[in-house]
């Protein structure tokens, strides 16, 4: 094995500049999926209630909680597991179900009220995580892993990933040309890249495709639906610092039974992810 292909076990050997570049790539890799969850959730409530919830899941809060949760995870893991904790797409089905509930107390309910009950179900799902963590502390991870082997966690991860195919196709269909540019750049750098460029294909795909989008936008090209390729109006009108709208979660058995059991699937996904990462570091 030559020097350029040697596995680096200690990231500090890369030096600060390369560590920062890899960190930026990791940020871009997680960014799209993390912010897509609140966007999709809001679209579910829009379809069901005819309005976007002004409270509940927001992009800013999602990013903040993902960052805070990741830092807390690294403290608990003593900086030994290079993982990022972002949004889980597994809960999308639950949010969609709650958004479309129109019986009982949910009849005629606004999007904000339904979002409050859905978030209450997520809180209970979080409590299930706490219970599982206590069980692991009491009986040990080895005993728990007997019931969650790779043959169980692997298919769960695959199913969750495959369920996102429709979202990926829908997003790419906004502008197939830019989607192809990003994909082609990532594949090219991953296969033929040299040195540092070979390990940052996602970052290069984002940068180059964004430059292409800027050029197309300046040349007055539009998306197939006639919308602008890049629109900075919402960025210009928003404040540099602001607080998100707060809402107290509400609890109902129906919403809890819809949302909380999803935690079982995400637990298996999480265990599978951690096992895969642990096998490579």
Language-model-derived ranges and their functions:
Residues 1-60, 202-281:
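Helix-loop-helix hairpins and the membrane-proximal interhelical loops
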Residues 31-47, 92-107, 159-165:
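Membrane-embedded alpha-helical segments in integral membrane proteins
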Residues 37, 64-67, 86-102, 155, ...:
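Hydrophobic alpha-helical segments within and immediately flanking transmembrane helices
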Residues 44, 99-108, 136-137, 273-281:
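Helix-loop-helix connectors at the membrane interface of multi-pass transporters/channels
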Residues 50-60, 104-121:
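Membrane-interface alpha-helices at helix entry/exit sites of multi-pass transporters
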Residues 100, 113-220:
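Membrane-embedded alpha-helical modules
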